[in-house]
Amino acid sequence: MTVGIIIQTRTGSTRLPAKVMMRADDEFLMIDYIINQLQHSKLSNKMVIATTDLDQDNVIYEHVTNRNIPCFRGDEKNVLQRHYECAKKYSFSTIVRIPSDKPLIDPTIVDNAIEKFQSSSYDYISNFSVNVDNEHEFLPSFPSGTEVEIF
């Protein structure tokens, strides 16, 4: 079983454009914090950045490939297709999806989720849920910023 972490990212955010490329401190960008944290996962085999094929996201591609992190590029609007094509390209049998706006992601939480997924017969697990009763409600079971999905 090949477990791949896919960090989905883009610069086209409407609330805070290019936030992942903002400087977090004197040494690192926001995306670097996520990468650095997830490199400590003991149960994943590979990490890939998945961004769009838009020119504005060339900056993400250049930055992460300079760090020797693979970068997959795909359609901006169809995020699920981007994940599918990325997983297919890298032969992932299990996808760990991490949004790029989670710089404090805990690799222990990620590994615990991978372990739970591997020991179950579930097709999908996450450490948060969305309740649909005429509105969408985020129901975190872990602190904000530590969300992980596996499928």
Please give the residue ranges for each predicted region.
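Conserved acidic residues
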Residues: V3, N45, S93, D123
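Short beta-strand/turn micro-motifs composed of small residues
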Residues: T9, T51-D53
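N-terminal nucleotide-binding beta1-loop-alpha1 segment
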Residues: M1-P17
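Conserved core of the sugar-phosphate nucleotidyltransferase
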Residues: I105-F151
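Short glycine-enriched, charge-decorated loop/helix-capping segments at active-site entrances
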Residues: V20-D25
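Short phosphate-binding loop-to-helix
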Residues: D53-S120
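A short, N-terminal amphipathic alpha-helix
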Residues: L29-M47, N66-R67
